[in-house]
From Swiss-Prot:
The keyword Oxidoreductase applies. It comes from Bacillus cereus (strain AH820). Its cofactor is thiamine diphosphate. Gene3D superfamilies: 3.40.50.12470, 3.40.50.970, Multifunctional 2-oxoglutarate metabolism enzyme, C-terminal domain (3.40.50.11610). Keywords: Glycolysis, Oxidoreductase, Thiamine pyrophosphate. This is 2-oxoglutarate dehydrogenase E1 component. GO terms for biological process: glycolytic process; tricarboxylic acid cycle. E1 component of the 2-oxoglutarate dehydrogenase (OGDH) complex which catalyzes the decarboxylation of 2-oxoglutarate, the first step in the conversion of 2-oxoglutarate to succinyl-CoA and CO(2). Pfam families: E1_dh (PF00676), OxoGdeHyase_C (PF16870), Transket_pyr (PF02779).
Amino acid sequence: MTRKNTTTNPWAKFHGPNLGYVIEQYDLYVTGAGSVDPELQELFEIFGAPSFQDDVVTGDNTATHFSPQNTGNIEKILKVVQLVEQIRSFGHTLAHINPMEDAANGQSLLEKAMNELSDADLKAIPAKTVWPDAPEGIHTALDVIHRLKEVYTQSLAYEFSHIQDSEERAWLHQMVESNSLRQPLSNKKRTALLKRLTAVEGFEQFLHKTFVGQKRFSIEGVDMLVPVLDEIVLEGAKNGVEDVMIGMAHRGRLSVLAHVLEKPYSHMFAEFKHAKIEGAVANSGWTGDVKYHLGREQVVSNEEVSTRVTLANNPSHLEFVNPVVEGFARAAQENRKKSGLPEQDTSKSFVILVHGDAAFPGQGIVSETLNLSRLNAYQTGGTIHVIANNAVGFTTDSYDSRSTKYSSDLAKGFDIPIVHVNADDPEACLAAANLAIQYRMLFKKDFLIDLIGYRRYGHNEMDDPAVTQPQVYKKIKNHPTVRAIYADQLQAAGVLNADEIETITQFTQEQLKSDYAQVPPADTSDATIHVKVPDVVAKGIQPIDTGVELDSLRAINEGLLSWPEGFNVYPKVKKILERRKDALEENGKIEWALAESLAFASILQEGTPIRLTGQDSQRGTFAHRHIVLHDTDTNETYSPLHRLPNINASFSVHNSPLSEAAVVGYEYGYNVFAPETLVMWEAQYGDFSNTAQALFDQYVSAGRAKWGQKSGLVLLLPHGYEGQGPEHSSARPERFLQLAAENNWTVANLTSAAQYFHILRRQASILGTEAVRPLVLMTPKSLLRHPLTLSTASQLSEGRFQPALEQENLGTKPNKVKRLVLSTGKMAIDLAAEIESDKHEYNLDEIHIVRIEQLYPFPAEKVQSIIKRFKNLEEIIWVQEEPRNMGAWHYMAPILFELAGDKVKTGYIGRPDRSSPSGGDPFAHKAEQELIVSHALDVKYNFRQDKLEIEVFSN
């Protein structure tokens, strides 16, 4: 028998979705159609059917009594609950978020559910039954539906259903469903907003009329981007943020520079006129860049707060600035002045990334960068993304540029809340901006605003968009600007009258004309094809003594080989480390990894922080580094470099995600914003670094020449031909050498642990100086433990990095030397190994070998001095393991011709031209390599008399 207790009502605590669940469970309980939750089954047995008795107050203040004791009412409640959730989840399909469309096209998703309930049904259900947090004045379910449709289907549309954290999802719904998000703006703020829109529109139209045909990539159609950025920056400053980093492409960039970053109009106009104007700050390198790629740094303030805003320099390679700016932010957030890991404070800075609607889903770098957002080594406490959505990519319509409904859909996979907003509704746009910054500051996670507008002109101002989008541009031609729309709204609301609005417009025009009048005539007197590189750059890195006292090295080594008591090091790793114990003693040998650790420790002791990342950088791809140890029992980690004495600089080494482009961009950005830090990126294999080629081309190699943006980033690229096939042999040094010019970076391929030690210390010594430049290192694989690459303690404690090294025990009879062999990296070691073996029958008196350790800048003076010693020299040969069309040959050939003069032949020995870097057969590789070595060491292997004829090894 069912027992009833009428004194209590356990159902009162169930509302909304929970109520729907209880009703479904009771239906199963009554019909026996399925299993019922045991706790609810007990309640049903004790209390019977769920009772939600309440008085429903209707709009005419009459009260009706409602009790869902019968099945019909239960079903209606369930349908209302489902409808409420559908509005929250799919209301965006009904929203008017596209100013170029009259109505939303998603009616069918909700109309069925809405048609199943009459107004009378809805009026009979208390609001609190289906919406526990219903605000004051919402009495019935009909009120609930009207209110939620007003929230979710107007010019703001929300996508929160994909958010996995229930607390975050509840907070987001509460924010948009309460009145807190869209509080009416004061008349003062509404007037200020109109003034801002008038300035943006006036600036763009002034450029359009004054500099006819010049590219400016107008913001018009998404003008609200500027006030949105204003709002985010201001609210960030109110929250104590010290640095706001902005990354964006060229669309709207000039207006953002002029308004958000307060670049004077006169300076902008001077760039269009190619005029010199007093007070303009040079923001470019010696070759420069177009005006819509340039960045700026500015302290932005109002009467209450201030913050520093940095707009990053940017190429036209869309979205590749994203990880760079994330690196800026992480560098700004971290305190690197203590030993151990840096101390991060994500409240100190945050990132705003402005995306294009075609580029956001189209460029893979976007996904790579989003993937960094929750990773310990890369997270920055949340980025605010703004898609400046003009619904077209150059001439490509959205249906040809993405496979998703919205351009923002990619963000759903990364648990990012999304707000779509009509760019013709200024106050809705500001509400979206406020929600974004509040969410970021509270939850320390990313947020996305899809600012949907249009593009008033073509991709650039010389392009006619009506050729490819004729129907849309008929609409756009007759569509009022957002400034005009908002001005009409303020006039209708009595905030401003027509004369006051006209006064605002005239003030903007007078300001533009006044600033233009300050710009002198064009001045092309300094236009020249001869670009002057700064002297400190042109001179290259001067010799620097980088040795470390032997006692200091021994003390460091002792610290590197110690760990906390009770810490259980993996036995195999322990043996590797213990072998290093006597490496600095007499007759000891230092291998590559130990030389690196000693360099790191000595650099840290001199006050330089270090950051190293890569896919396997803690252990090392080749199980050589072991700079982070793992306890075999607890999996806790320990790095000896965190506990060494006399260190006041941080050390961080992180395993990166399986990404090259985003990580290289991030580390480059980190280094730019933390110039005192030795920042290093290590490829798993150098072969894979080419997926970051755009970063090497646009930023690392050219950033200083274009923008004056200095970097000391170190690239560690494992390289060497060992019969492992075309994906595990070549870091493609030819590409880095092709980009080498104007002393833009150092490219090296080393042959000893000591050389690695010294070049790292040299790189650390130039950080933060005008001499700084990136360092590209072809690092070893099989050579990591090769006997011929090992070094002695004295080679670390004395001297400096040597750009060129002579092979020991050769060239001792200068008058007999006929052939000078130049080589680098593993190829040089293969030659040395053959020389030291007892198998050869070469006449070594007639040959000398020079290892070119630093390929760029080439050590010409050093090599020339060596050549002069050999009066009977007949030929200079470049020997490499790469195919002739790869490696350093095409870079070296003109250098050799100049070094050789008229009397000495030059030549090449190596693999022939090939389309693939390496073959896949290890036996064929070995045979080829042996033949290259034998031809290089056999002086009888003759070359043609004409020095321009290159002898090529072939099978």
